[in-house]
């Protein structure tokens, strides 16, 4: 007599992980690109993802969700809406129409700059920063510095994916930024 294995309980993080596509050698040879678009295309996986973030932050007494350009603009506004909070876009330089403050950071080959409006938040506001993934941590670190320069308290950085082999999560935690990620992948 054969026995079917007992059904395992639903694991949201495992499910999210299974919905992320790996594209080898993109955008260059040796890179394993973690593509979140399949996750976003399915209502169930998008709902599971947003629900994970909502559960994490519903009782945190936040004032804003800040999203990093560009894929943080996908999850960030949805999360802000679900939590009844405002959304702060942290943009690449030259994309915001009002007066801004900016922060430059190093990339693997060169540097980049992000900025926010100078009135994006006020001293004492509690903010979570969201993005699709944490690689080197440079963009999230720059966003943290910008928000803190305006007097906000960044309570946590959040991402769907952590790529710990690239050192970003270690860098951010070392700088005092707690992190929440749904899943992680080794390699580059």
From Swiss-Prot:
GO terms for biological process: adenine salvage; AMP salvage; purine ribonucleoside salvage. CDD domains: PRTases_typeI. One of its GO terms (molecular function) is AMP binding. InterPro entries: Ade_phspho_trans, PRibTrfase_dom, PRTase-like, UPRTase/APRTase. One of its GO terms (cellular component) is cytoplasm. It catalyses: AMP + diphosphate = 5-phospho-alpha-D-ribose 1-diphosphate + adenine. Its main location: cytoplasm. Its EC number is 2.4.2.7. Keywords: Cytoplasm, Glycosyltransferase, Purine salvage, Transferase. It comes from the Bacteria. Pathway: Purine metabolism; AMP biosynthesis via salvage pathway; AMP from adenine: step 1/1. It holds the Pfam family Pribosyltran. Gene3D superfamilies: 3.40.50.2020. It is found in: Cytoplasm. Homodimer. PANTHER family: ADENINE PHOSPHORIBOSYLTRANSFERASE. Belongs to the purine/pyrimidine phosphoribosyltransferase family. Catalyzes a salvage reaction resulting in the formation of AMP, that is energically less costly than de novo synthesis. This is Adenine phosphoribosyltransferase. It comes from Paraburkholderia phymatum (strain DSM 17167 / CIP 108236 / LMG 21445 / STM815). The lineage of its organism: Bacteria, Pseudomonadati, Pseudomonadota, Betaproteobacteria, Burkholderiales. The gene is apt.
């Amino acid at each position: 007599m054969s026995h079917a294995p007992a059904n395992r309980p639903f694991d949201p993080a495992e499910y999210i992980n299974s919905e992320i596509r790996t594209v080898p050698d993109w955008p260059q040879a040796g890179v394993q690109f973690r593509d979140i678009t399949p996750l976003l295309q399915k209502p169930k996986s998008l709902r599971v993802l947003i629900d994970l973030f909502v559960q994490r932050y519903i009782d945190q007494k936040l004032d804003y969700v800040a999203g990093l350009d560009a894929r943080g603009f996908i999850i960030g506004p949805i999360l802000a809406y679900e939590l009844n909070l405002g959304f702060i876009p942290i943009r690449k330089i030259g994309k915001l129409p009002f007066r801004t403050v900016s922060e430059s950071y190093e990339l693997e080959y060169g540097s980049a700059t992000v900025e926010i409006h100078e009135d994006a938040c006020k001293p004492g506001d509690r903010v979570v920063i969201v993005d699709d993934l944490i690689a080197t941590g440079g963009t999230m670190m720059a966003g943290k510095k910008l928000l803190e320069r305006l007097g906000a308290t960044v309570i946590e950085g959040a991402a769907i994916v952590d790529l710990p082999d690239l050192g970003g999560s270690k860098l951010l935690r070392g700088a005092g930024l707690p992190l929440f990620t749904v899943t992680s992948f080794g390699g580059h």
